[in-house]
Amino acid sequence: MKNKHKAIAAAGIAAAAAGVIGYRVEAARRARADADTLRQAYESLNGQERLTDPGNYFQAVALPADIQVRLLTAQQAANMSEGTVFFGFPTCPWCRNALPLALEAAAGAGCTLCYCPLDEYRDVYALEDDALVEKTPAGPGYHALLARLGDCLEPYTLTDSRGNAVPIGEKRIFAPTIARFHNGALTNFWTLEAIGFQLPEGQSKYAPWSGERRGMVRETFQKMF
C-alpha cells in the first residue's frame, strides 16, 4: 500500500513538473512569436516611401534579436495592472525613433515591454466639407482604454476650413504614448509633448534623431523603468 501511495505521489509530482515545463515552453514560444511579429512590422518598412506622404521615406530601424516584448490587445492594455505599455504603430515616424530606445531601457531594467498596436484599434475622423465623418471605427477595447487612461489624454479635435477647432467628443491616444501601471494604478504617463521634445527647425520627422535628442528620450525612459 505504501509503495502504491508513493507511486501515486511520484506520478502527481511528475505531472505537475511536466505542466510547469510545458507552460514555460509555451510562454517562451509566445514571447519569440511576439518579438518576431513586432520586428517584422517595423523592419519591413525600412527605406520605403510613405504612400500617404509622397517624397518621405521611413527610416531604417533594427530591433535587437533578443528583445523582450509582449503584444497586447487594446482590451488587455485597458485591464493592465502591472507593467509598461508602449502604444504605437510602424508607420508612425516618431515611434520608429522611440521604440528602439524604449526596448533598450526595458532590457536594461530587466523588464518586458508590452506593446499595443494603436493603429489596429484607434478610430479616425475627418472633415468633409466641414462635416464630421467617421473614417475608421474604434476597434474592440479602445473606448475601455480611453476610460482607463482618462485625464492623462488630450481631447480629439480637428480643424475646419475656417481654422476653427472641431471637437470629436472623445479623448485621443497619440503615438507614441507609454503608460506604466503598478498595483493596478496608472503611475507614469509618457508622451514626447510631455517631456518637451522638439525637433530642430527644418528637420523632417522621418529623419533619425540626433544623439542629443536620443539621449534626452533615453534618460526619461531609464527613469520610468
Indicate where each model-derived feature is located:
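Loop/turn elements at helix/coil->beta-strand transitions in domains of secreted/extracellular proteins
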Residues: 80-83, 109-114, 182
